[in-house]
Amino acid sequence: MHQIFPSTFFNFEFLRLLGTAPYLGAETGECLATAARIKDGDPESWYQAWYEQAQKALALADEAKAVGDGPGAAWGYIRASNYFRASEFLLHCTPEDPRILSSAVASADAFDKGWILLDGSVRKVEIPYEGGNTLPGRLYLPAPHHQVSGKIPVVVQTGGFDSTQEELYYYGAAGALPRGYAVFSFDGPGQGLSLRKDKLYLRPDWEHVTSKVLDHVIGELAPVHNLDVDRLAVFGASLGGYLSLRAAADPRVKAVVSCDGPLDLFDITRSRMPPWFINGWLSGWLSDGFFNWVIDRLASVNFQLAWEFGHSKWVYGVKTPADVMRTMQKFSLKDGYLSKIKCPTLITGAADSFYFTPQQNAHPIFDSLSALGPAEKHLWIGKDVEGGGLQAKIGALALMHHKMFAWLDETFGIRRDEL
């Protein structure tokens, strides 16, 4: 695979953005010009370059809007939204940085400006949560000429470890709407504006989050918008794959797509550490203080490690690397939870992910779906960048959409005429 940046981490995040170009999230020339202004491993240059490009796209959108060019304005606003999102992404080692929230708000605002000019419709929704808080959501509805017969099948899409609701559009609604599916996406605790504005932290028992989301989608939105609650799927990618499987134990979920999700977060992180170090800490032979000191020293010379632990501390609401490791132990599907899933399930893996392997995750997840027969569960392992081999199918979103919706069509009995 061609490297735009020498480091795997920066290259992956660049491809993550460039891969949205088919769905209005980026322009190839703009991305290449922006990459030329970024110093590999330098989050400040990353922020400045993408923020400047977001402002340029915003100006183009305003210019198009002023002359009545709806498509030009929509595309410009949506690109600006994605560039704003990318700009703050690598600042998460210092979550108190005010640029994180301001860029996230700018991303959401630009996205909404663009979407009202596109085919189809979207409704902004607030989901009642806990402690008087709400979770921001969007219901995307297909245009009438894309709708299938009968009620509208719906996909409830959850984010993951580091996504925002605006980014979720490229993975879900962009493929769903032309195929006649509605999509409901949301920022849960630890995600998007729920984290940045409301300081709600990620939780392992995601079924408690999606239970409230399903209450609202089924009880409030479905009757008004003709949604088919008997053809309701849940979808998530990367950590969202884990979260979607937590949601799938709810009997109201009729199908689930878990894209490249982990089986056990702690096991993945543990496998990347020297055995003497992690086992010494687990046994108590090495103290929290020593563990934290070692991680902090390594992070001072390895930006990817610094970002991973910095972002983890933020989304989990903890203070130290040792606290991160203890929290990760709660994010596991190894306790028999998968046996609770009774709905048809599509599991995917990424053979070329630099985070974790299908052998660690996709295969044991698939094998642990003990309540499902062979016809009720399906496994797809993507290989190479063009074949869905990168984490969350980065760079192969069209293929992911094809695989996912072909499987959902079959599962939900949706028949389409040959073209």
From Swiss-Prot:
Keyword Hydrolase: yes
Domain of life: Eukaryota
Pfam families: FrsA-like (PF06500)
Enzyme class of the recorded protein, top EC level: hydrolase
Protein's pathway: Mycotoxin biosynthesis
GO molecular function: hydrolase activity
EC numbers, comma separated: 3.7.1.-
Function: Hydrolase; part of the gene cluster that mediates the biosynthesis of the mycotoxin lucilactaene and the lucilactaene-related compound NG-391 that act as cell cycle inhibitors with potent growth inhibitory activity against malarial parasites, moderate growth inhibitory activity against cancer cells, and no activity against bacteria and fungi.
Name the record gives this protein: Hydrolase LUC6
Organism (species): Fusarium sp
